[in-house]
Amino acid sequence: MVENRPILKFLTHLILIIGIILICFPVYVAIIASTHSSAAFSSGTLPLLPGKYALENYNTIFGDGLMQRGLPNLWPLLMNSLIMALGISIGKIIISLLSAYAIVYMRFPFRKTAFALIFITLMLPVEVRIIPTYTVVAQLGMINTYGGMIIPLIASATATFLFRQFFLTVPDELLEAARVDGAGPFKFFKDILLPLSKSNIAALFIIMFIYGWIQYLWPLIVTTDQNHQTILIILKQLIVESLQHDPQWNILMAVSVAAMVPPVLVVICMQRLFIKGLIETEK
C-alpha cells in the first residue's frame, strides 16, 4: 500500500509543475513572439505578453510575405508535410500489421529468423542507410516525388514488434472459434484482430505521424524542387536568413507556431486512444 504523505504529495506535484513549465514555456514564448513586430526584439529583451501584430505576422506567412523572400507559400509546405506524415504513418501501420500477422499466425520456414532480421534493423542508424537508399531512389527516378519522400520510410521494425507482442496476447480460442465459423485468414484479421488493435493503432499512428512530420534530413536530400519541400526545410532556411541578414524573429516564430499546430491537433484529437493504446501495449 502506498503511503499518502503530504510532503511526498507536495514534492510530486512540484516536480510535475516544474516539468510542465520547462516544456511549455518555450512554446509560450514562440506564440507570444509571433504577435510582436521585429523591432520588439532589437532591444534584446524578450516580451512575455501578447503584442498587436499577430494578424499582420500570420497574414505575412500565409500570404505573399514568404514569396517576397524567394520562399514558397506556407500552405503548400504544410500540405507537403501533411502528405508525408500521413503517408509514413499509414504506410508503417499497414505494413507492420501485415508483417506481425504473418509472423504470429502463419507457419512458414525461417519464420523466427525473419522476425529477427526485422528486429536487427533497429540497430542500424539512419546515417548508415542514407547513401544506398538515396541511390536506389535516384535510379528509380523518384527524386522530387512524394513516393521518394515516403516509401523509403514506411517500414517500421518497432511497430512490427509492438503489434507482434499484442497479437501474442490474443487468446487462441478466438482463432479456433473463427475457424469453426468458417472464417479464413483474411476475415479473422479484418473482423477480429483489427478491432482489437484499434487502441494500439491509434497510439502508433500518433507516434508515427509526429515522426513523419519532423523529418528533415531525408526530404532535404530527395527534394530539390520547392514544390515538394516540407515546412521544416523552409523553417531552417528562415533561420539561416535571419542570422545572416536583418533578423525577423516574429516571422520565424509565426512559422514555427504554424508548424506545431498539425501534430498538436492530432495528439489532442486522439489522446484518449493514445493513452489506452500505450497501457494495452504495456500489458
Kindly give the residue locations of the regions a language model identified.
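A structural signal for multi-pass alpha-helical bundles of membrane permease subunits
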Residues: 2-4, 8-283
